[in-house]
Amino acid sequence: MSSVLINSIAVLAGLGFAVGVMLVIASKVFKIDSNPLIDDVASLLPGANCGGCGFAGCAACAEAIVEQGAPVNSCPVGGFEVAKQIGALLGQEVTESEKEFPFVRCQGGNQHCTTLYDYHGVENCKVALMLCDSRKGCTYGCLGLGTCVQACQFGALSMGEDGFPVVNKALCTSCGNCIAACPNGVLTFARDSEKVHVLCRSHDKGKDVKAVCEVGCIGCKKCEKECPAGAIRVTEFLAEIDQEKCTACGACVAICPQKAIELR
């Protein structure tokens, strides 16, 4: 073996040893002691790293709960059981709240809303909107390309025959990723105890809505006038229901000429 090769190996080994020593020293000097409670809380979280809590992942959520005062029930995937365990660990009392599920505020679909053209591109609502605007006559409604389904890592959403996403509540963790993925904001959270819903998001004038959709809200205010609880307000041609006031009497459902309000 030549002396040049031996010297090269020796220099390389020396450099490796020196760098290793420097790394060990640096790890000691710059060591940051973490709060052991963060690891304890993180071990209780499901590890889905879905971001439904609003943080980067489960580790960030645990840190926020321990050091930033985030609620112990921040994790929607873990639900009440995980929140209860974290609360016991941190000495906080936890009360169970009603779970929310994604809800589709549109019923135009393939049957009731005008389709402007056949789309044969990427099956993604955001991409379709960027390339050629809405394929539906109503620019507020569901495009039916399944971006929300693709965003759900728990397999809780599927596309129904009418072109709308269907939620499997048994699999849904209420992480909210499907809601965030919808470019038209058609999906929103709703509780099972909230019985009456306006199945429309259009703020267009009534005549424009009727021109493209058979079941869209036209802002006629009949529901607002009929509601005995004063739970409905029509703003910018769209009815909105105050769930705190709503008694689910069904008066608004019966009087709506467009059948845009549903009693579940």
Swiss-Prot record:
[4Fe-4S] cluster 3 binds at residues 152, 172, 175, 178. Keywords: 4Fe-4S, Cell membrane, Electron transport, Iron, Iron-sulfur, Membrane, Metal-binding, Repeat, Translocase, Transmembrane, Transmembrane helix, Transport. It holds the Pfam family Fer4. [4Fe-4S] cluster 5 binds at residues 246, 249, 252, 256. One of its GO terms (biological process) is electron transport chain. Belongs to the 4Fe4S bacterial-type ferredoxin family. RnfB subfamily. Binds 5 [4Fe-4S] clusters. It comes from Methanosarcina acetivorans (strain ATCC 35395 / DSM 2834 / JCM 12185 / C2A). The Rnf complex is probably composed of eight subunits, including RnfA, RnfB, RnfC, RnfD, RnfE and RnfG. The chain crosses the membrane at residues 5-25. One of its GO terms (cellular component) is plasma membrane. This is Ion-translocating oxidoreductase complex subunit B. It is a single-pass membrane protein. Its cofactor is [4Fe-4S] cluster. Disruption phenotype: Deletion of the rnf operon abolishes growth on acetate and ferredoxin:heterodisulfide oxidoreductase-coupled Na(+) transport.
